[in-house]
Amino acid sequence: MPERDPILLTPGPLTTSRMTRDAMLHDWGSWDAAFNRLTKSVCADLVRIAGGGDAYVCVPLQGSGTFAVEAALGTLVPRDGRVLVPNNGAYCARIAKILRRLGIAHSELPFAEDEPASAQAIDAALARDARITHVALVHLETSAGLLNPLDDIAAVCRARGKALIVDAMSSFGALPIALAGSGIDALISASGKCLEGVPGMGFVIARRAPLEAAEGRSPSVVLDLHDQYAYMQRTSQWRFTPPTHVLAALRAALDQFFDEGGQPARGARYAENCAALVDGMRALGFEPFLDARAQASVIVTFHAPADPAYAFAAFYAAVRDAGYVLYPGKLTTADTFRVGCIGALGAHEMRGAVAAIGGALRALGIAMR
């Protein structure tokens, strides 16, 4: 018998459903009318999930979600613009790195890795520096599982007349987001996250007005979001070879998303997964890194055992042998590891993961208390 695939307790790639995987068993012609209809239907549904309405358009891009982040920043921020980056983790820092590489003026507003970005502090930073034109916010900082207060920060940006670009990579589909009336210029996510597709396609749900004003602004050809948008409007096609199988899988994943009950049901399942995980891990002696008020139900960071017998590589391997894949820590201030709560999983799989982690502790002689 073939070996069973391990259960991925990661923030993407994820464990996917059989229906999603089966959707990739068919080949598509990239210029064929049927594939063009597939692209159109997926983009329309992504705008629908985001609550965007006619003022927004979805522009898909080949590659990981970070490709789409760089495309949005390089296309939507004018050359004389300046970006404020609230920074409480590795993915916020990545935005700052992209801006440096693009030569876009920016400033960082630092927060601790366990501290949600403060709308009041952002408001004060905007008041201090009138040169700032944009705020680039990570909605859910995946390095810790930290949720930043999107609605409060969007309200500040609206009041100050600043454009807001949101990296919603690990929140879109799981947490409520309503673009209409929000003042958000762009929301960025990817196929292989909370929509439970496979990796390979990022997308930007952008407000039409600033996108249409951005012709010729991007320093890149392949990451020119305006050019991708304009070409798709003219031809219904992608500029370059599209990830056909990824898109077909995402179509199947979206069908399942709506059948489940959309974002409220998806978010409720992930919350149940998170509760089962945290309760079980606490029973083993683990403590989450974040306070419960800042914790999103997508991925949980746990403090590593203090026992000298603990080494992440051996711990990971022991849990992997039991059929579960963990995620390493990404914090600078604490020794941690991460466990994802998303994918085609339920509380049963989370309890199985806890049992596997307990077995690994016993096998490796790691004491928790």
Swiss-Prot record:
Its cofactor is pyridoxal 5'-phosphate. It catalyses: (2-aminoethyl)phosphonate + pyruvate = phosphonoacetaldehyde + L-alanine. Its EC number is 2.6.1.37. The keyword S-adenosyl-L-methionine does not apply. InterPro entries: Aminotrans_V_dom, NH2EtPonate_pyrv_transaminase, PyrdxlP-dep_Trfase, PyrdxlP-dep_Trfase_major, PyrdxlP-dep_Trfase_small, SP_NH2Trfase/AEP_transaminase. One of its GO terms (biological process) is organic phosphonate catabolic process. Keywords: Aminotransferase, Pyridoxal phosphate, Pyruvate, Transferase. The modification N6-(pyridoxal phosphate)lysine is found at residue 193. It holds the Pfam family Aminotran_5. GO terms for molecular function: 2-aminoethylphosphonate-pyruvate transaminase activity. Homodimer. Involved in phosphonate degradation. Belongs to the class-V pyridoxal-phosphate-dependent aminotransferase family. PhnW subfamily. PANTHER family: 2-AMINOETHYLPHOSPHONATE--PYRUVATE TRANSAMINASE (PTHR42778:SF1). This is 2-aminoethylphosphonate--pyruvate transaminase. It comes from Burkholderia thailandensis (strain ATCC 700388 / DSM 13276 / CCUG 48851 / CIP 106301 / E264).
